[in-house]
């Protein structure tokens, strides 16, 4: 099980990302637009750099929904590989079977 403080910090990052997402998208659009002037582009870059680091979606870590394990995360299930394996063996995941060939 992950430390509760790390899980809480990750949740806080998700909120910050959501809060700044729209403005970040606008600034990135200005920066990437070939029709914007150099000054507009520079101002947009400057404002983007002034935003908090945690506003970047890259800083959010995918974690197991059950216990917060940060590694071995499977997006399809929202769980770690260890938990998926245990749940599959117990038959708690519909449509998931142990492979055999």
Swiss-Prot record:
Keywords: Ribonucleoprotein, Ribosomal protein, RNA-binding, rRNA-binding. The keyword GTP-binding does not apply. GO terms for cellular component: small ribosomal subunit. One of its GO terms (molecular function) is rRNA binding. Pfam families: Ribosomal_S14 (PF00253). The keyword Ribonucleoprotein applies. Signal peptide: none annotated. GO terms for biological process: translation. Binds 16S rRNA, required for the assembly of 30S particles and may also be responsible for determining the conformation of the 16S rRNA at the A site. Part of the 30S ribosomal subunit. Contacts proteins S3 and S10. Belongs to the universal ribosomal protein uS14 family. This is Small ribosomal subunit protein uS14.
């Amino acid at each position: 099980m992950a430390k509760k403080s790390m899980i809480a910090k990750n949740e806080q990052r998700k909120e910050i990302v959501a809060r700044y997402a729209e403005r970040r998208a606008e600034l990135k659009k200005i920066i990437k637009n070939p029709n914007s002037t150099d000054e507009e582009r520079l101002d947009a870059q400057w404002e983007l750099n002034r935003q908090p680091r945690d506003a970047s979606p890259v800083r959010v870590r995918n974690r197991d929904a059950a216990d917060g394990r940060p590694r071995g995360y499977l997006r399809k299930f929202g769980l770690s590989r260890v938990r998926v394996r245990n749940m599959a063996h117990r038959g708690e995941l519909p449509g998931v079977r142990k492979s055999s060939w």
